[in-house]
Amino acid sequence: MEAKAIAKYIRLSPQKARLVAANILGRPVEEAMNILKFTPKKSAKIIGKVLHSAVANAEQISGVDIDNLTVKQVIINPGPTHKRIMTRSMGRAFRIVKRTSHITVVVAEN
């Protein structure tokens, strides 16, 4: 059986989140949690929360052994961007793009 959790509109660049997501793909949940705990990135903490939520969702399904769960998929999609303007000298303005992400974690029994 599969269980998934989704976090949307997370104020985090998808490119930076994918670097951390690649480390836990295909690993057992316990090992993935340890990897995320000791990864010094903002995205590691957020992906860890989503993974924890996916495991909690798997507990709600009857007949699922939590110890045998593995990370089947970690999908990081871009969300909408927040566009801002930074004023510069001589009347100019530079555009700042603050990116967001939609994070999906799927866990399954092996």
Curated annotation (Swiss-Prot):
GO terms for molecular function: rRNA binding; structural constituent of ribosome. It comes from the Bacteria. InterPro entries: Ribosomal_uL22, Ribosomal_uL22_bac/chlpt-type, Ribosomal_uL22_bac/org-type, Ribosomal_uL22_CS, Ribosomal_uL22_sf. Pfam families: Ribosomal_L22. Gene3D superfamilies: Ribosomal protein L22/L17. CDD domains: Ribosomal_L22. Keywords: Ribonucleoprotein, Ribosomal protein, RNA-binding, rRNA-binding. Disulfide bonds: none annotated. One of its GO terms (cellular component) is cytosolic large ribosomal subunit. GO terms for biological process: translation. Part of the 50S ribosomal subunit. Belongs to the universal ribosomal protein uL22 family. PANTHER family: CHLOROPLAST 50S RIBOSOMAL PROTEIN L22-RELATED (PTHR13501), LARGE RIBOSOMAL SUBUNIT PROTEIN UL22M (PTHR13501:SF8). This protein binds specifically to 23S rRNA; its binding is stimulated by other ribosomal proteins, e.g. L4, L17, and L20. It is important during the early stages of 50S assembly. It makes multiple contacts with different domains of the 23S rRNA in the assembled 50S subunit and ribosome. NCBIfam families: rplV_bact (TIGR01044). This is Large ribosomal subunit protein uL22.
